[in-house]
Amino acid sequence: MSGISIQSGAACATPSATDVEGVPARTWQGPSAPERLAILRRARSIAIVGASTNPARASYFVSTYLLSSAPYDVYFVNPRATTILGQPAYASLADLPVVPDIVDVFRRDADLPGVAREAVEVGAKALWLQLGSWNEEAAAIAEDGGLDVVMDRCVKIEHARFHGGLHLAGFNTGEITSRKQRVSARR
């Protein structure tokens, strides 16, 4: 278990300074909730990079939600697939028939800077890295290219929480709620 030790029989302990050596500190500051809502409201199309044909994958679950419960034109990017959920799959962002407003990424960390460069090259408006994805190099590439950036957030959860749909996934923890929030966004 990554070198974190539990002291004095405690069930949970904070890591010591030596436990987190070599782990880069998060310095990038992401958009606020109203800013994320504005990104979602401005968007008309979303490209899902790393979309999967496997129903057990998070990208598949997010894709089904976006197709059934969100107003976006959804495009799938996966060079190994021909169709996903009955829609064509494309080998790259450059192969899409439109420039996507949001590039939603389900790829491993090492691939994120390259996806950010590709999003800038095609003229996308936002780079969205899913839950668990945090890459400051990719964020810098995208921001330097004029894109909005969201990291470590699920586009499905964010859309659902702003539109009262979290109950569809069973979320109601108090931190993320199924109740509609009144958030004003600048357009």
Language-model-derived ranges and their functions:
Residues 158-187:
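A charged, well-structured terminal subsegment
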Residues 2-23:
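Helix-enriched interaction subdomains in cytosolic or periplasmic regions
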Residues 47-49:
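Conserved beta-strand elements of the Class I
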Residues 26-32, 83-113:
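Glycine-rich, highly charged phosphate/nucleotide-binding loops
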Residues 52-57, 64-84:
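NAD(P)-binding Rossmann-fold cofactor-contacting core
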Residues 136-159:
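Short acidic, glycine/proline-enriched helix-loop-strand junctions
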Residues 69-72, 122-127, 145-147:
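A short helix->loop->beta-strand "cap" motif at the edges of active sites that frequently abuts
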Residues 119-142:
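ADP-ribose/adenylate-binding Rossmann-like module
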